[in-house]
């Protein structure tokens, strides 16, 4: 364990006090909203509609960041508030109750499958190095989400969820598995 009691740099950020948890909760939700705003803005942009490859890459990055943030929320707090999209201007979808995490995973899987199709491999494009979200990272995150959705995340009482393990996602039909099997 880390002797640093003022930071949250331990393995998987397990050390936290009440202030730290509140800050983390707010910052992760801020990331989901910012990523959702980016996804919405990119999808509605003229450049994306005209087939800009850069906008396609940016969409993949935004989808990945949104999925990563929601997975982190679910991993840390279980059932959380979730919305698929941006906040309405009248704020009617801002203050929402939490929903079952098993209802969130299909959205994350859908987003990650789209992100995998949008992103390049590391080194495939000039500025896409290990410091950018790449196809390899997106495939790894998709696999992690699939594990959690299939029941890998243990629930209260150390029992697996009632989730259908075979359902998330069918790896043989997953576009990312072609490279893995070769």
Regions found by a protein language model. Name each.
Residues 85-92:
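Short linear capping/connector segments at secondary-structure termini
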Residues 131-141:
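Amphipathic alpha-helical protein-interaction segments enriched in hydrophobic
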Residues 2-77, 92-128:
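Conserved, well-structured interaction surfaces
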Residues 74-81, 123, 148-157:
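Short coil/turn linking the two alpha-helices of tandem helical-hairpin repeats
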Residues 158-177:
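Eukaryote-biased recognition of long, low-complexity, charge-rich segments
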């Amino acid at each position: 364990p880390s002797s640093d009691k003022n930071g949250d740099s331990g393995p998987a950020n397990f050390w936290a006090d009440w202030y730290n948890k509140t800050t983390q909760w707010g910052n992760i939700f801020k990331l989901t909203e910012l990523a959702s705003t980016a996804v919405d803005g990119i999808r509605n942009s003229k450049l994306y509609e005209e087939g800009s490859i850069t906008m396609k890459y940016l969409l993949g990055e935004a989808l990945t960041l949104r999925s990563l943030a929601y997975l982190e929320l679910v991993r840390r707090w279980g059932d959380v508030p979730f919305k698929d999209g941006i906040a309405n201007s009248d704020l009617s979808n801002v203050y929402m109750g939490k929903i079952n995490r098993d209802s969130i995973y299909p959205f994350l899987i859908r987003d990650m499958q789209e992100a995998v199709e949008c992103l390049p491999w590391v080194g495939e494009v000039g500025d896409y190095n290990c410091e950018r979200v790449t196809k390899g990272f997106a495939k790894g995150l998709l696999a992690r989400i699939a594990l959690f959705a299939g029941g890998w995340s243990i629930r209260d009482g150390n029992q697996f969820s009632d989730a259908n393990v075979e359902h998330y996602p069918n790896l043989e039909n997953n576009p990312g598995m072609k490279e893995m099997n070769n």
